[in-house]
């Protein structure tokens, strides 16, 4: 899906010193250019903001400064392989903007909404979006709140990274998706155990066709594992209103 666009020399890429992470330099060179192309300068500015303001405000730990490219930006942006042109994407529990902002940088055709409940994170996200000049909406709220769906509409894709277990992610994501929309959850090495543990709850919430896919296998030393599932055509649950109580 990505096209390599040569926007500078090898030496110019080397000037982006924070690119050098746990991956081999040649691998980073290929991955960065393949994913970000002519928007590499925007990605670098985002990395700088994460390394400074993001860490200062506690959105990331200080030990993350030397692995922002491989662990965070590339890890997030490769999910774009699974997205269609013009997809309407919601990043649930966006935090410091991961994976939503790397996706928006790599794929400006996407319509990205960052959904985050905490004010300090929302403030950071809005500052970053303004600084980078991105066409991205930041919404302060929780996925389970009814007004959130009214605000952002039905999305094609709900993405998340290190937010919650699959049962909760499914509960939060389904109401924000159009029928047939996709949930893309970046997960770790215990992904199959997690699916086995939560598959019945996921199905009861309307998730169908649960599968595990790998992104970035051609150019990342550690490809990214993603749980992909769809919102069923018939079973769709609306989020609860804030303050509503169940009646017996």
Curated annotation (Swiss-Prot):
Give the UniProt keywords, A-Z: Cytoplasm, Methyltransferase, rRNA processing, S-adenosyl-L-methionine, Transferase
The GO terms this record gives for MF are:
rRNA (guanine-N7-)-methyltransferase activity
Write down the EC number: 2.1.1.-
Q: Which InterPro entries does the entry mention?
A: rRNA_ssu_MeTfrase_G (IPR003682), SAM-dependent_MTases_sf (IPR029063)
For this protein, the record's CDD domains field holds: AdoMet_MTases
Write down the SUPFAM superfamilies for this protein, in alphabetical order: S-adenosyl-L-methionine-dependent methyltransferases
Cellular component (GO) terms are: cytosol
Q: Which top-rank group of organisms is this from?
A: Bacteria
Q: Which residues bind S-adenosyl-L-methionine?
A: 93, 98, 143-144, 161
First-tier enzyme category under EC: transferase
State whether keyword Ribonucleoprotein applies. Answer: no
- According to its UniProt record, which protein family does this protein belong to? Belongs to the methyltransferase superfamily. RNA methyltransferase RsmG family.
* Function, as annotated: Specifically methylates the N7 position of guanine in position 518 of 16S rRNA.
Name of the molecule in the record: Ribosomal RNA small subunit methyltransferase G
Q: Which organism is it from?
A: Mycobacterium leprae (strain Br4923)
Source lineage? Bacteria, Bacillati, Actinomycetota, Actinomycetes, Mycobacteriales
